[in-house]
Amino acid sequence: MAPAIQRQWLVARRPVGRPIEPADFELKECPVEEPSPGEVLVRTVYLSFDPAQKSWMENAAGYMAPVEIGGVMPGSGAGVVVRSGHPDFGPGDAVYGRLGWRDYATVPADALDKAPEGVPLDAVLSVLGGTGRTAYLALMKVGQPVAGDTLVISGAAGATGSLVGQIGKIAGCRVIGIAGGPEKCAWLTQELGFDAAIDYRHEKVRARLRDLAPAGVDIFFDNVGGEILNDALARLAARAPVVICGAISRYNFDPRSPQMPEGPRNYFNVVFTGATIQGFLMPQHERDYPEADARLAQWVRAGRITPRADVQRGFENAPATLMRLFEGRNVGKQLLQVEAD
């Protein structure tokens, strides 16, 4: 049974040109909406967090519908169907999709997917959905790895980067991850099977790339931007694809401000190497979602991909959980378990 009242987090301010703050959100209660025909009422078990959510709040993401002040904070989640107005879903079904920051969410059925059997809900959000689809499609369709390629990933200990590295290993690549701190680097090499890791906080990235990839970087998968991107551009192999998936080093700056970090200085090496730079947006690859979902679920069941979630607890902690991403505190996929216990 669903309660009569649901909790939801609303967007109260736009964090343009600065870090996210708790006052950017407002916690409110409202009546639970009964599902109309074509809708489903879901009890949220986990919420998923991604750096792109900051750009959604700023209305800087042109591929997303505008987020209004006073509107529910958008985001993905996983949960259990309570009541359904659609024949494809029934009470008790485990689902994931665009739930928003709500402990009970009434959403259109086409905003949901059923969780694969044998995959726990936290692993579903860690490996499937937007995170997994981004990792798989950006690497396989844009990066197009070939066995023997040297694949370098920035933000490698994050949700997307850690998956990209594991998929790269399955594809036969030599994988080098760039992450911040010895704990994250050890996790990449000792648990996920990366061939090497570079600690950008304590090592010079360009020098380490020269040592670890003397013939050059065959694929660079970028989640960070800034100086790390600049260093990678200097070490590209001939015709290397550079996949731009994120730029978390720049997200806290107003693009109109003089404080915005400079763009890469080594971009002209793209000319010398014949490399390509291509951005990735998941909605542009919608027709390939079934392929990504099937492959990822298969690899999880077979133990070829190791999910890891950084799980915080308590619905009231949603804003602080999002802020963890920008503080570099998460290892793996950042999730929030709605119930505290």
Ranges and model annotations:
Residues 31-49, 57-101:
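Glycine-rich beta-strand-centered segment in the early N-terminal region that forms part
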Residues 126-203:
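Mid-domain Rossmann-like dinucleotide-binding core that forms the NAD(H)/NADP(H) cofactor-binding site
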Residues 205-214:
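Short amphipathic alpha-helix with an adjacent loop that forms part of the alpha/beta core around
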Residues 94, 150, 174, 240-241, ...:
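Short glycine-centered segments of the SAM/dcSAM-binding site in methyltransferase folds
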Residues 102-103, 180-188, 262-267:
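Short, glycine/polar-rich helix-capping loops at beta-to-alpha or helix-loop-helix junctions
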Residues 227-305, 338-341:
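Glycine-rich phosphate-binding loop and adjacent beta-alpha segment
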Residues 2-6, 304-311, 319-341:
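C-terminal capping/lid region of NAD(P)-dependent oxidoreductase domains
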Residues 73-80, 90-155, 304:
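NAD(P)H dinucleotide-binding glycine-rich loop of Rossmann-like/cofactor-binding domains
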